[in-house]
Design a protein with these regions (language model features):
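Rieske [2Fe-2S] iron-sulfur-binding domain
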Residues: 4-13, 17-20, 30-152
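Short edge beta-strand segments in beta-sheet-rich domains
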Residues: 26, 114-116, 277
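Detector for Asparagine
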Residues: 14, 20, 26, 48, ...
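C-terminal catalytic domain of Rieske-type non-heme iron oxygenases
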Residues: 137-290
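Short Pro/Gly-enriched beta-strand edge/turn motifs at strand-loop
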Residues: 24-33, 96-104, 183-186, 260-265
Length: 290
């Protein structure tokens, strides 16, 4: 079986003449839930790079998690105003990574700085950019309008805490993009033997670097989850659609309606059936963890 993601990923260049098949750096990644970042520094490894995040008066800052003085992780320090203070000798760094205070001396040594990362807050997540800062355009994050819509109720996964996996993020993406496994892995919830007879459709948009897998099932018994949620009297029409936006954004849309009432993803209200959208955003930690 060919993976439609692989061909498209190979075309994503980090910079002219460079193609990194392991990590795409010129892209936004979810670094944390907004609620995870408070008064204490938060350490994360993002694309093999140790990062520390902390909250400022204006938002969130992200710095290299290493003091330029003696290399102690800055996450072992504390937040002082809008600065991050190293826990070893008290050097303070502002959100740009520049050292702004050295205890015991008034002059800041040349080169006393650490790397800072572009960050933004959107859809309840903190996003980080580990590539060329000049290319960090906010509109590169897809428009997932339903996450801000009052007509949709958003339920944070795992209560708003990340899931750590000892697997490469491409394997995680492959699993999330594979809608053929539902019958067997999720037989007691959203899987059903009857769906395997309906074809899976693949669509690709090269310019947008987007791939979509979808399967529409007509006039079949409702899967256990949908039957419980929708209390359908008879068979249903249902759909399973997963859209992958590079580097690793996975947006799924799935639902069931009464037979013949119309499969219209994004437009199914509770009076017609059951619809849910599931966001999975696997962020690479290392080559072997996500």
């Amino acid at each position: 079986l060919a993976c439609p993601l692989c061909k498209t990923r190979a075309m994503w260049e980090n910079s002219p003449g460079e193609i990194n098949l392991m990590f795409v750096r010129n892209a936004w990644y979810v670094a944390a839930w907004e609620t995870e970042i408070g008064e204490t520094p938060l350490a994360r490894t993002i694309l093999n790079e140790p990062v520390v995040m902390y909250r400022t008066a204006d938002g969130v800052a992200a710095l290299e998690d290493r003091c330029c003085h003696r290399a102690l992780p800055l996450s072992m320090g504390k937040v002082v105003g809008d600065n991050l203070q190293c826990g070893y000798h008290g050097l303070q760094f502002d959100e740009s990574g520049q050292c702004v205070k050295v205890p015991g001396q008034s002059k800041i040594p040349p080169g006393a700085e650490v790397r800072s990362y572009p960050v933004l807050q959107k859809y309840g997540w903190v996003w980080i950019w580990t590539g060329d800062p000049a290319k960090a355009e906010p509109d590169q994050i897809p428009d997932w309008w339903w996450l801000d819509s009052p007509e949709w109720r958003t339920i944070p996964g795992r209560g708003g805490t990340p899931m750590h996996l000892n697997a490469n993020y491409l394997l995680v993406s492959d699993n999330l993009f594979d809608i053929s496994h539902l019958t067997y892995v999720h037989a007691t919830s959203i899987g059903a033997d009857s769906i395997v007879d309906f074809p899976v459709k693949t669509e690709r948009w090269e310019e947008e670097k987007r791939v979509k897998m979808s399967r529409v099932i007509y006039d079949r018994p409702a899967a256990p989850f949908y039957q419980k949620a929708g209390k359908f009297a008879g068979n249903v029409d249902r759909w399973i659609m997963t859209t992958s936006d590079l580097p690793c954004y996975m947006a799924s849309d799935a639902g069931s309606v009464e037979v013949g009432t119309g499969v219209t993803p994004g437009e199914v209200g509770p009076e017609r059936g059951v619809e849910m959208k599931i966001m999975n955003l696997p962020t690479p930690e290392t080559e072997t963890s996500t």
